[in-house]
């Protein structure tokens, strides 16, 4: 009977999907997906929770560097209650080590102006780090994605 249970156990273990075991790339991208969902709430405090406490943000529409939680909240305060949205269009991932991952790509911010949706293509680079058991954004650079005119 013991042999039977061993066989059942091994069979069940082999049936588990490999995707259930996430690595640094998956964890970092999940953190960025949480950031995007938080941005879509238009709540600065919710957005800021996705950043490390000592994070640096070079925001799309800011002439200054935002450093630390309070500065990041201040940066996102103008989005509060606006209905602005973010959608990640494309990304690439570079694993630095088991606790640091760089993700770069394109996203689109859609802001509401007089009830009309105005898309703003942008590009980003984020350094996502594991602090303790949590992944957070340590560095975030965002800028408009302006296509060259022919």
How does the language model describe each region?
Residues 57, 102-103, 137:
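Short hydrophobic/aromatic-rich beta-strand segments that constitute the beta-sheet cores
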Residues 121-148:
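Short beta-strand edge/turn micro-motifs at domain boundaries
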């Amino acid at each position: 009977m013991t042999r039977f249970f061993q066989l059942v156990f091994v069979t069940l273990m082999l049936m588990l999907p490999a995707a259930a075991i996430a690595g640094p790339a998956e964890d970092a991208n999940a953190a960025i997906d949480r950031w995007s969902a938080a941005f879509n709430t238009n709540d600065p405090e919710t957005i800021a929770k996705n950043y490390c406490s000592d994070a640096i943000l070079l925001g799309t529409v800011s002439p200054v560097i935002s450093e630390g939680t309070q500065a990041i909240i201040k940066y996102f305060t103008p989005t509060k209650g606006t209905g602005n949205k973010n959608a990640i269009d494309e990304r690439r991932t570079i694993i630095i080590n088991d606790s640091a991952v760089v993700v770069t790509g394109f996203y689109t911010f859609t802001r509401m102006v007089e009830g009309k949706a105005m898309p703003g293509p942008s590009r980003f680079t984020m350094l996502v780090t594991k602090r303790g058991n949590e992944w957070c954004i340590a560095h975030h650079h965002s800028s408009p994605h302006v296509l060259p005119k022919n």
